[in-house]
Swiss-Prot record:
Its EC number is 3.1.1.29. This is Peptidyl-tRNA hydrolase. GO terms for cellular component: cytoplasm. It comes from Dinoroseobacter shibae (strain DSM 16493 / NCIMB 14021 / DFL 12). It is an enzyme of class 3 (hydrolase).
Length: 235
C-alpha cells in the first residue's frame, strides 16, 4: 500500500494558492483514476483507490501546513506503514515553474509542511517536488506562496497536473523513471522530427536550342555529255 500526501491549506481562501499545488495534484489523481469520494479522516480529507494490485490512499491534511505531520502520522499508524510507503507532493521554490523532481530523504529546506512531517515520521519518505519558481527575495516568499497562481501560469500548471495524473500508477509501482517520463510528455512534449515539408525548387528555365538549319539543296551532279544536253534541249 502507498500513502500519497498532498500539502496545502484547507478552505476556499487558499484553494488556488501556489502553496496548495500538492492538494491540486491529489485532486487530479483522484479525478483521473476514479478514486472514492473524499471523506474526513486522519485530520484531513482522504480518498481511496487502486493501481492494479497496489492500494493507494490519498490524504490532504486539514491541519494547516505547519502541522501537516500530525495528519500523516495518524494515517501511517492506522495503516501500519513505513516512511518509504509515503509519497509527499509539495510546492518547491527552488524549481522553475512547471518543473518536477522526485527525491527520497534529505532535509526540509525550510518548507514548513515538510518540517512538520520530519518531526512525526522522520526524513526517509519520498517527495514529489513541484516547481513554482522563486519571487526573487526571501522577504517576498510568504506572500508569494500564499498568492493564487496567475492566469498566465494556467497552461503550464494544467500540463504539470495532467502529467502527474498520467504517471501516478508508475509512481505507486516504484518506477520513478517512467513517472517522470509521463510528466515530461505533458510538460515538454517531443518535437516532431519531420519538420516542415520540403518543397521542390522550381526548375530553372532553359532555352531550347534553335532548330538545326536544314542543309541547302545542292544541284544534282551533272553527268550528261554535251551531245546529250543538246538533244534534250530540242525535245
Amino acid at each position: 500500500m502507498k500513502l500519497f500526501v498532498g500539502l496545502g491549506n484547507p478552505g476556499p481562501k487558499y484553494a488556488r494558492n501556489r502553496h496548495n499545488i500538492g492538494f491540486m495534484a491529489l485532486d487530479q489523481i483522484a479525478a483521473d483514476h476514479g478514486f472514492s469520494p473524499w471523506r474526513t479522516k486522519f485530520s484531513g480529507q482522504m480518498a481511496e483507490g487502486k493501481f492494479g494490485s497496489t492500494k493507494v490512499t490519498l490524504l490532504k491534511p486539514e491541519t494547516f501546513m505547519n502541522r501537516s505531520g500530525q495528519s500523516v502520522g495518524e494515517a501511517m499508524r492506522f495503516f501500519k506503514l513505513e516512511p518509504e510507503d509515503v509519497i509527499v507532493f509539495h510546492d518547491e521554490l527552488d524549481l522553475a515553474p512547471g518543473k518536477c523532481r522526485v527525491k527520497t530523504g534529505g532535509g526540509h529546506a525550510g518548507h514548513n509542511g515538510l518540517r512538520s512531517i520530519h518531526g512525526h515520521i522522520g526524513p526517509e519518505y519520498q517527495r514529489v517536488r513541484l516547481g513554482i519558481g522563486h519571487p526573487g527575495h526571501k522577504d517576498r516568499v510568504s506572500g508569494y506562496v500564499l498568492s493564487d497562481f496567475a492566469k498566465a501560469e494556467a497552461a503550464w500548471l494544467d500540463d504539470l497536473l495532467r502529467g502527474i495524473g498520467d504517471g501516478a500508477p508508475e509512481l505507486a509501482a516504484g518506477d520513478t523513471g517512467r513517472f517522470m517520463n509521463a510528466v515530461s510528455l505533458r510538460t515538454a512534449p517531443p518535437r516532431s522530427s519531420g519538420g516542415s515539408p520540403k518543397t521542390d525548387k522550381p526548375a530553372k528555365a532553359t532555352r531550347e536550342p534553335p532548330p538545326a538549319a536544314k542543309p541547302e539543296a545542292t544541284p544534282e551532279e551533272e553527268t550528261r555529255s554535251p551531245l546529250q544536253r543538246l538533244v534534250d534541249k530540242f525535245r
